[in-house]
Each structure stands twice: as structure tokens, then as C-alpha cells.
Amino acid sequence: YSEKEIARVVRVAFELAKSRRKRLHSLDKMNVLETGRLWREIANEVARDYPEVELIHMLADNAAMKIITNPSEFDVIVTENSLGDILSDEASVITGSMGMLPSASLASSPPPPGKRRGRRGRPALYEPIHGSAPDIAGHNIANPVASFLSASLMLRWSFGLHEEADEIENAINKIISEGYRTIDIAGDQDHKLSTSQMGDLVAGIISSGPK
């Protein structure tokens, strides 16, 4: 822990919140951990630079309950790594599968809408939140949505290609809303697709252009 590193992470979260619903939840364990008290202190200091963003402090265990009982309360959450690892896996239950969730490890704030980064972009790491699944490797049944959405985050946050990112997200939303699913999220009445079939559908919608 260092004040500089906490401030960097919290500032990225404020920038994200400023471009979204202007609401930021900061999670900690300040009631039992000195590091939690430091986290909250630094978050309050950074908040002075973002008067337009509502900062809400919450203990991590309380947040764990509310993520399940009232997930719409949250938009942008900022917390330290060990708490974030736990809560991000918990949040995946809401979507029905870890195969639905992308992730981005950012070193700085994303470019605002309408601003492109250029060909080289900005270094960051994008990947699904799940790890490897060797037990289903080669069976063509994995959910590729998290991989597609990770690519969308890359276009949006490293390159500022917001329209292109929207095309990927809109294609996925269209397919899922029409009842096409991989087996991990499919119900009895849904059209069950393999990994490659889901990929072909997404690619087909994107190649046909925005509607």
C-alpha cells in the first residue's frame, strides 16, 4: 500500500464514474484494517477534485450482500485487489455465468467518448475474468461472450473506438435477447449454440453494419 498508488486507482474510478452515472462506491474494511482507513482517507482527498461525482463509502461485507440483493444500486466500484477479486467473482453470479464477464487492467483513465487514441493506443490488459478451463478445452462449448466484451473494452479504453465497441456490445445484446445462448446460460426454451456458432452470429451481425 502507498498513498500514491491508492490515489492513482481511485482517480481512474472517478474518471469512469464521471463519464457514466456520476456515482462511485468505494469499498473497504476500515472498521478492522488500518489499510482500510488509509484507503478511505485517500479516496476522500481525491474526491475533492470530482465534486460532480457522488462518493459512497461502504464496508466490503455489506457491499457483498447488496451486490446480490440490489445490484442496480452499483455502477462503478473501486476497492483494493483482495476485496475486488472476491466481489467480482460474486458479481458474476448475477449474469448467470463467469463466461459473460470481461475485465480490463488499466494503468490510467480511459479516453473520453469521441477521442481516439491513435494506432498505438494505450497499454492495458484485457481478458475474461475466468481462468482456464482445461476440462472443456476442445469441446466447442465455452461461452465466448466475455472474450468478445474484453475486445470491446480494448477498443473503447485503449483506442477510443467507441462506435466500434458499441457494435460488438449491440451484436451480443441482440443475439442474447433473441434467445441464442451457449449452454452455460441457456434455458429450456433457448436456442443452444456452440462456441463457434455464437462467434459466427456475432461476426455476422457486425459485418452487416449497424442497424
Q: Model segments located where?
A:
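Phosphate-binding loop/pocket of nucleotide- and phosphate-handling active sites
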Residues: D190-K211
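A domain-level signal for the structural core that forms small-molecule/cofactor-binding pockets
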Residues: E5, I67-I68, S97, S207
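Glycine-rich phosphate/diphosphate-binding loop of Rossmann-like nucleotide-binding domains
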Residues: Y1-D61
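Glycine-rich phosphate/nucleotide-binding loop
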Residues: I68-Y180
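A structured beta-alpha segment of the ubiquitous adenosine-cofactor-binding alpha/beta core
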Residues: L55-F74
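Generic structural signal for well-ordered alpha-helical scaffold segments
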Residues: R11-F14, I68, A203
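Short, conserved micro-motifs enriched in small and acidic residues
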Residues: E3-A7, L33, G138-V145, L193
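Flexible, glycine/charged-enriched surface loops at secondary-structure junctions
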Residues: S19-D28, Y50-M58, G160-E169, S177-D188
